[in-house]
Amino acid sequence: YTSETLAFFDFCRTGLHEDGYLMHKYQPDGAPGSSWHPYIVGNRCIAPIQEDETAIVVFLFGQYYDMTGDKQALEEFYPSLIKPMATFMADYIDEVTKLPHATYDLWEEKFLTTTYSTAVVYAALVAAGKLAEAVGEADDAVHWQAIADDIRRASQTLLYNPDKAFFYKGYVHKSADAKTDIMYDDTIDMSSFYGAFMFGLFDMESDEIKESFKTLQRVFMASDQEVMPMPRYEHDQYNRVDEESIGNPWFICTLWQAQYFLETDRQQAARKIVDWVQSRMLKSGVLSEQINPYTHEFISVAPLAWSQAEFINTAIDLVTDEPEVLSTVSKDA
């Protein structure tokens, strides 16, 4: 599917802001779409963006190049897409913390420097450095890798909460003048864990990753469950069916757990989650955003492309590890 991938990169290039970032949403012709993100936070005028959306495109291009070795695409998109994006990310760094400045989070709700967005920015700058090296731009490669190293180093001390044995959702400076006085959000958020391990911000064998997964199990898993259906974060109120529940399960977050199992060689545990998702999938193959935790009825958007994509992503990784799974996944899906 290389032509589709290149068409996506071309679309991103069309809508790229002159400062090197992507806006929250776009219309089909590449014009900025509607957004509910405010331009003013406190007394500051800010770009109403989610930095992870910019970062993930650079990371994806790195994955594309690693898989295809497409020099022609790299030479075309490096000056017009990769370099502007990487330059923006490398410049959009808090000089005190060495972490990215706050932007809106991936759930489109909070203005924070989140663990998730930090992880994606880190991985994107690593990828950008390798792409720069591939086109002979040594100065770019060294600079972006150095910024990535600073981010990873700072994350070890600023983004893990030992009191909760979990990653902070994020933090924000208390005011524009409070350079070192920061306010943490310690909500247990699945995206914080996913970002930390999937994008290499923390080592897979680190105590932070291991203890954080134990915390997820303690907070979200009932004693009689084989699969831990995951909400976005604790006490998520979006479309919550029961005020006493911790939140509705989301397919994407539950599948992130399966991806963690695959990364830690627990294929059978991952397979149980894939089976759990398939058992709730419509006969048409459609997945929703969320489900009712008691009746398993679909809630909110269906189909949700993100849910579909995470299922395919997880199933492909599972098939790669266990080829015999292919026949059952393709037959049942």
What does each of the following model-derived ranges do?
Residues 85, 89-156:
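Internal metal/ion-chelating core segments
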Residues 2-68, 72-95, 273-305:
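Helix-terminus loop motifs that line ligand-binding clefts
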Residues 3, 48-56, 77-80, 112-124, ...:
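Aromatic- and histidine-enriched alpha-helix N-cap/loop-to-helix transition segments
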Residues 27-29, 101-109, 170-174, 234-236, ...:
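Short linear capping/connector segments at secondary-structure termini
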Residues 1-15, 71-89, 134-158, 205-219, ...:
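Extended, well-ordered alpha-helical scaffold segments
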Residues 1-3, 46, 56-73, 120-137, ...:
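Well-ordered alpha-helical scaffold segments within catalytic/enzyme domains
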Residues 31-32, 242-253, 271-333:
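CBM-like carbohydrate-recognition segments
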Residues 14-39, 114-119, 141-252:
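Extended ligand-binding clefts on enzyme/binding-domain cores
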